[in-house]
Amino acid sequence: TCSIPYEYSNGKLKRTLYYSNGVYANSFTENN
């Protein structure tokens, strides 16, 4: 199961996907 924590980076909402073991699966910035 992957968790999707949300963090603010430079005033933009950054979503990073983590594996259950805590390894980075994919990192990108939300751009709506």
From Swiss-Prot:
Keywords: Secreted, Toxin. It is found in: Secreted. The keyword Secreted applies. Expressed by the venom gland. Coiled coil: none annotated. One of its GO terms (molecular function) is toxin activity. The keyword Protease does not apply. It comes from the Eukaryota. One of its GO terms (cellular component) is extracellular region. Its main location: secreted. This is Hainantoxin F8-35.23. The lineage of its organism: Eukaryota, Metazoa, Ecdysozoa, Arthropoda, Chelicerata.
